[in-house]
């Protein structure tokens, strides 16, 4: 074989190779699809994390450290004013004990922090109901003494004289004793105080009369105002 033939064969062998199907355009398309898939997965993962940790989405109502709902002071004030207006036209009474009379419960309505409103009356030391309905009845007395030379039993009772039947009925009653044991004669007597509070809701009729009683009025402590009182509020 001649030298020229050999050179020509080498040149033919070094010619351009045939391109594979797809070429650079196919590679770019695959790269774009890969990037799109990665971004889609990353976005979905981020959204899931935000929802899981409640960074986005509906927020819960704000609560106080004690897990109590915070109260809007404006709404609370409106509620209190509405309740006050609702009670302003209903019968009510709050009477206090006369500190000038010892040894008995004498109720007074013409004193500071005492009142009779919307038909309520104080007659013969009794509160007179002006209309049928549900009423909150309450009363408190305070007993005091020095030592316990003997066993002391104290009672406080609220009674009703109804127009529908003549007999007196006890609505509220309580018994207490300040002395769990007698004070020795050689020991110095210690002062004791025993309050009794009564309260309840009852259906009353127009003309019913309410009174209070204590079994040992000599132990009543009337030294300070606001300690002994009697009241009724229509509901």
From Swiss-Prot:
Coiled coil regions, renumbered to chain: none
GO biological process: extrinsic apoptotic signaling pathway via death domain receptors; immune response; necroptotic signaling pathway; positive regulation of canonical NF-kappaB signal transduction; positive regulation of extrinsic apoptotic signaling pathway; positive regulation of NF-kappaB transcription factor activity; positive regulation of transcription by RNA polymerase II; regulation of biological quality
Residues spanning the membrane: 36-56
Modification after translation, per record: The soluble form derives from the membrane form by proteolytic processing. The membrane-bound form is further proteolytically processed by SPPL2A or SPPL2B through regulated intramembrane proteolysis producing TNF intracellular domains (ICD1 and ICD2) released in the cytosol and TNF C-domain 1 and C-domain 2 secreted into the extracellular space.
Disulphide bridges, residue numbers: 148-179
Pfam families: TNF
Cytoplasmic face residues: 1-35
Biological classification of the source: Eukaryota, Metazoa, Chordata, Craniata, Vertebrata
Protein name per UniProt: Tumor necrosis factor
Positions marked as site (Cleavage): 34-35, 39-40, 49-52, 79-80
Entry similarity comment: Belongs to the tumor necrosis factor family.
InterPro entries, A to Z: TNF (IPR006053), TNF_alpha (IPR002959), TNF_CS (IPR021184), TNF_dom (IPR006052), Tumour_necrosis_fac-like_dom (IPR008983)
Lipid attachment locations (N6-myristoyl lysine): 19-20
Quaternary structure and interacting proteins, as annotated: Homotrimer. Interacts with SPPL2B.
Species this protein is from: Oryctolagus cuniculus (Rabbit)
Domain THD: 91-235
GO CC field: cell surface; extracellular space; plasma membrane
Keyword Transmembrane: yes
Compartment annotation: Cell membrane
Modified residues (Phosphoserine): 2
Membrane topology: Single-pass type II membrane protein
Keywords from the named record: Cell membrane, Cytokine, Disulfide bond, Lipoprotein, Membrane, Myristate, Phosphoprotein, Secreted, Signal-anchor, Transmembrane, Transmembrane helix
Matching PANTHER family: TUMOR NECROSIS FACTOR, TUMOR NECROSIS FACTOR FAMILY MEMBER
Residues in compartment: Extracellular: 57-235
GO molecular function terms attached to this record: cytokine activity; tumor necrosis factor receptor binding
Record's function text: Cytokine that binds to TNFRSF1A/TNFR1 and TNFRSF1B/TNFBR. It is mainly secreted by macrophages and can induce cell death of certain tumor cell lines. It is potent pyrogen causing fever by direct action or by stimulation of interleukin-1 secretion and is implicated in the induction of cachexia, Under certain conditions it can stimulate cell proliferation and induce cell differentiation. Induces insulin resistance in adipocytes via inhibition of insulin-induced IRS1 tyrosine phosphorylation and insulin-induced glucose uptake.
């Amino acid at each position: 074989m001649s030298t020229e033939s050999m050179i020509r064969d080498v040149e033919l062998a070094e010619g351009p190779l045939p391109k594979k199907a797809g070429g650079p355009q196919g590679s770019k398309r695959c790269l774009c699809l890969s990037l799109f898939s990665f971004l889609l997965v990353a976005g979905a993962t981020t959204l899931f994390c935000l929802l899981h940790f409640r960074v986005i989405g509906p927020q819960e109502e704000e609560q106080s450290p004690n897990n109590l709902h915070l109260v809007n002071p404006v709404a609370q004030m409106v509620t209190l004013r509405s309740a006050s207006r609702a009670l302003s036209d209903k019968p009510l009474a709050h009477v206090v004990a006369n500190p000038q009379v010892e040894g008995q419960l004498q109720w007074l309505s013409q004193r500071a922090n005492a009142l009779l409103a919307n038909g309520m009356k104080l007659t013969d030391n009794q509160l007179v109901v002006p209309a049928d309905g549900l009423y909150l009845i309450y009363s408190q007395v305070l007993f005091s003494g020095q030592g316990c030379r003997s066993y002391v039993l104290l009672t406080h009772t609220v009674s009703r004289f109804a127009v529908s039947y003549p007999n007196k009925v006890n609505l509220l009653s309580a018994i207490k004793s300040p002395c769990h044991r007698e004070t020795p004669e050689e020991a110095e007597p210690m002062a004791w105080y025993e309050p009794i509070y009564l309260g309840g809701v009852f259906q009353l009729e127009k003309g019913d009369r309410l009174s209070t009683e204590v079994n040992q009025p000599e132990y009543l402590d009337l030294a300070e105002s606001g300690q002994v009182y009697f009241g009724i509020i229509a509901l």
